[in-house]
Amino acid sequence: FEILNRVLFDAPGAPVKKALMDAQIGKDIQSSYDNGIMQPVFSVIAQEARDDQEDEFVKILEKNLAKIAKEGIPRRNLLAAFNYYEFKYREANFGRFPKGLMYGLQMYDSWLYDDEKPFIHIKTNEIFKQLREEIENGYFENLIKEYLIDNNHKTIVVMKPKKGLQKIKDQEEADKLKAYKDSLSEEEVKKLVEETK
């Protein structure tokens, strides 16, 4: 799915992201795949989209995914995604984080749910080889169809920010703390201050 995510959304000129951006759905489109949990999740997020764009977002997303699943993903796009991830894998550059720590965290992605396979997320080289062999037989197009188009476990979540909400919450908390402090005697306040130094 990381390969698909790269091809469909992350790579320069990625077709699904481009279609959503061309339709001016939100200010940016982001996607992610999280397989470090019991039930892996693939997400597509339209940042700062308007409420009335929800149906259009879903329609464009599904239409473009269906078109790509039917017509096929260009081989060079898949190979470019493989090259990108293989380079990252071989380079093993985790920035300021130690390699051992990052490898340990990667192991948890599978080890937490299957104690027989702690190294599955580290032994990626074999998987790259197997997946490269699948490029020609429609494997990736079938993944799109089965898991992104025909999946009955998908959901649409619209998050609506409320302007000034944090200020309201901060004021409520300040009022609550003031009321608590006012309920204490001077001696209780001093004791509390001493205990929390």
Predicted regions, residues:
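His/Glu-based metal-binding/catalytic segments typifying zinc-dependent metallopeptidases
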Residues: F1-G13, S43, P98-K117, H121, ...
